[in-house]
Amino acid sequence: MKGLIIGLASFGLTSAAAVSSLAQPVARRGCLVSDEGAIQDPAIQYTEKTVRRQNFPSNFTVDVNFHLASTEEEADLITDEIVDAQWKVLHEAFARYDINLVLNSTERTVDNLTGSAFLINEGPDKGWVYHEEEYNTYLKATRKGGYDALNLYFFSSYSPGATGYCQWPTPLAETDELTFWKDSCQLSAMTMPGFTAEQGAFESWNLGHLAVHESGHWFGLNHTFAGGCSEPGDFVSDTPAQLTQIFGCPEGSDSCPNQPGLDPIHNYMGYTDDACTNEFTPGQKDRMFSTFFNFRRK
């Protein structure tokens, strides 16, 4: 799959449009980041050239800020042990690709609206109501660091069935204040390692790999199934084409038999089980470096 793709907003898909899907709870795992697979933009060609032309450092360091939001009933749910386990998974996953994540801060908020990710079921008349104004105010008060700082928000009660969402890197953050403040990843705490099924953990996605997946979007990676079997797919040349979302861990799966390679079921940017995912490709590493230094740290 050839080419590169950058920001959500730069493709005419605003962050508000993507987040609004929170108002419609889904039935199974759902990363709420849209599939940009078929969308073209001048930034693609620009970044494809720079990844060949520029000499990026062999490694780089990124400050990470954890934000833990719980409802009053679930105030003690996200324990320090769970946070430590999640951090270990996240740090080790990216360290293998010469991206050194440093935990800069961890802060907790106990509040029913915040802990519910600002999505409340207000009864049969109103249904699910997304409190966007309060959400924006919360982000402005809590987001830390510059545009090159990764802020991860874990919510004890998230949109039912959804697992997470993350912002793409975009040049709009340089001129639009709200785009900057919204630059973050949000996740269901039930994807963190250490929760049990009785506590509400996702059965197949509770080893902490969702934080790796969403952070991959923050670094500019698309889903492996973006674009299906057609070029340019996910805009990374060494990830085999994949027709659609794949669940479980079906070894030998080949949903695009006329394209080289088997389905990349072990890639962090797919939807297979946490126990199945363990890698990025060299091309994905190159793309993370390129998008980071072209859009996040110039």
Labelled PLM ranges:
Residues 1-24:
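Fungal secretory targeting signals
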Residues 19-148, 155-156, 293-296:
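Propeptide-to-catalytic entry region of secreted or membrane-anchored zinc metalloproteases
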Residues 62-68, 101-103, 149-154, 183-189, ...:
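Structural recognition of the beta-strand scaffold that forms the well-ordered cores
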Residues 69-72, 107-110, 156-161, 191-194, ...:
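Solvent-exposed loop/turn segments at secondary-structure junctions
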Residues 84-87, 91, 184, 209-212, ...:
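Extracytoplasmic/secreted envelope proteins and their assembly/folding machinery
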Residues 139-223:
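Active-site-proximal segment of zinc-dependent metalloprotease catalytic domains
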Residues 200-279:
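The catalytic-center signature of Zn2+-dependent metalloproteases
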Residues 277-298:
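Pan-zinc metallopeptidase signature
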